[in-house]
Amino acid sequence: MKLENIELSFDNFASEMSKLKNQKHFDYLVTIIGEDFGEEGYGCIYILENTDNNERCSVKTIAKKVDGSDVIPTVVNLWKSAELLEREVFDFVGIKFLGHPDMRRLFLRTDFNGYPLRKDFDMSPEANQFPLTDEPESDFTVEYSLNADGHLVATKKRLFDDEDFVVNIGPNHPSTHGVLRLQTVLDGEKVKRIYPHLGYIHRGIEKMWEGMTYPQTLALTDRLNYLSAMMHRHALVGVIEEGMGIELSDRIHYIR
């Protein structure tokens, strides 16, 4: 499937994304990919799908530099799934999404220094010492916006009300089938909100791959998910083969 590739500027990004959702019925946000585009700056690629006809498009936008930070308007108001996807981009690339209600890290510790998927990230062991203390806890998050003068404003927001009862499910719990922590906010027996903490077994595979040859990366795809190791390996190999223009024999197709 070939994607229609769209490039949007910072100024028309919010309005054009709204048109794609509401007028062209791209109702499914498949993913958001944060990228370090070198001299272009930091930006995102959004993969959208129209679930009526299965048409897909990709949207690229470059973040605007404001007061030393890279910012892009949030699309949480259009696609609710963007809430976690934008937090992941912020966590690894450092882009702040204007209007996002909960701009915290998602995978890495709150006291982690830097954004590891930036090309200039310092990979030295001295700069990435394993912390010996517990992760700092906070009942607050932050929302970013631009004021009338175009400056970046950080607004502190509470995560919990005074009467909220918070239960931690995980990091290790038999019902989660994996290592994650769910801060579950209860009102009596009703679940009001869940704040996920997802980075307990995150190993930085994306960053490790940057210094490897293609064959060396194959063992790491198998470790992404023990239920679908072969599927991940086929996905990576397929992209490499297509990019190199390799024609596969019938034997390979049959084996796969």
Show the residue positions of the predicted features.
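Active-site- and interface-proximal helix/loop "cap" or "latch" segments in soluble metabolic
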Residues: 169-256
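Terminal low-complexity/charged segments
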Residues: 1-190
